[in-house]
């Protein structure tokens, strides 16, 4: 399951409550074509990797979160462990997304 983040406090709470689990954050926008293309794959990964926390942040709805995380383009995927960012990449690259998850869990 992918959790939609609607505020900066909800983002912090999601990172904190994840504990030791890997957190994968998809920063996207409704008007972004590549974001729409990879979204179903991102959701399928959330079912495949049930021990990983998947979050979605709409950069237009949560500009403060996007700014704090220094998101420059969409989609951007950021990976967190224990509240700290451990990896990041931009672009709708399905293979890289799954490989990064596998490498971090």
Swiss-Prot record:
What is a single molecular function from GO for this protein?
protein-disulfide reductase activity
| Protein modification | In the fully reduced protein, both Cys-69 and Cys-73 are nitrosylated in response to nitric oxide (NO). When two disulfide bonds are present in the protein, only Cys-73 is nitrosylated. Cys-73 can serve as donor for nitrosylation of target proteins.
Bridged cysteine pairs (disulfide): 32-35
Domain Thioredoxin: start-end pairs: 2-103
- Give the residues annotated as active site: 32 (nucleophile), 35 (nucleophile)
Q: Which residues carry this modification: N6-acetyllysine?
A: 3, 39, 94
Keywords from the named record: Acetylation, Activator, Cytoplasm, Disulfide bond, Electron transport, Nucleus, Redox-active center, S-nitrosylation, Secreted, Transcription, Transcription regulation, Transport
Q: Site (Contributes to redox potential value): which residue positions?
A: 33-34
GO CC field? cytoplasm; extracellular region; nucleus
Cellular localisation? Nucleus; Cytoplasm; Secreted
What the entry lists under InterPro entries is as follows:
Thioredoxin, Thioredoxin-like_sf, Thioredoxin_CS, Thioredoxin_domain
Q: Which BP terms does GO give this entry?
A: positive regulation of DNA binding; response to radiation
Its primary localisation, in coarse terms, equals: nucleus
Q: Which residues carry this modification: N6-succinyllysine?
A: 8, 94
Question: Where are the S-nitrosocysteine modifications?
Answer: 62, 69, 73
One Pfam entry for this protein is Thioredoxin
**Membrane-crossing residues?**
none
Subunit record text:
Homodimer; disulfide-linked. Interacts with TXNIP through the redox-active site. Interacts with MAP3K5 and CASP3. Interacts with APEX1; the interaction stimulates the FOS/JUN AP-1 DNA-binding activity in a redox-dependent manner.
Protein family (similarity comment):
Belongs to the thioredoxin family.
- Function text: Participates in various redox reactions through the reversible oxidation of its active center dithiol to a disulfide and catalyzes dithiol-disulfide exchange reactions. Plays a role in the reversible S-nitrosylation of cysteine residues in target proteins, and thereby contributes to the response to intracellular nitric oxide. Nitrosylates the active site Cys of CASP3 in response to nitric oxide (NO), and thereby inhibits caspase-3 activity.
Q: Which PANTHER family match?
A: THIOREDOXIN-LIKE PROTEIN 1
Q: Any idea what this protein is called? A: Thioredoxin
Q: Which organism is it from?
A: Equus caballus (Horse)
Lineage of the organism:
Eukaryota, Metazoa, Chordata, Craniata, Vertebrata
């Amino acid at each position: 399951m992918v959790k939609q983040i609607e505020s900066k406090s909800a983002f912090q709470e999601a990172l904190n409550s994840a504990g030791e689990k890997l957190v994968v954050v998809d920063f996207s926008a409704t008007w972004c074509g590549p974001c729409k293309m990879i979204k179903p794959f991102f959701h399928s990964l959330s079912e495949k990797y049930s021990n990983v926390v998947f979050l979605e942040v709409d950069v237009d709805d949560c500009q403060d979160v996007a700014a704090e995380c220094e998101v420059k383009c969409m989609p951007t995927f950021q990976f967190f462990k224990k509240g700290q960012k451990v990896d990041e990449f931009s672009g709708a690259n399905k293979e890289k997304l799954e490989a990064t998850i596998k490498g971090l869990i």
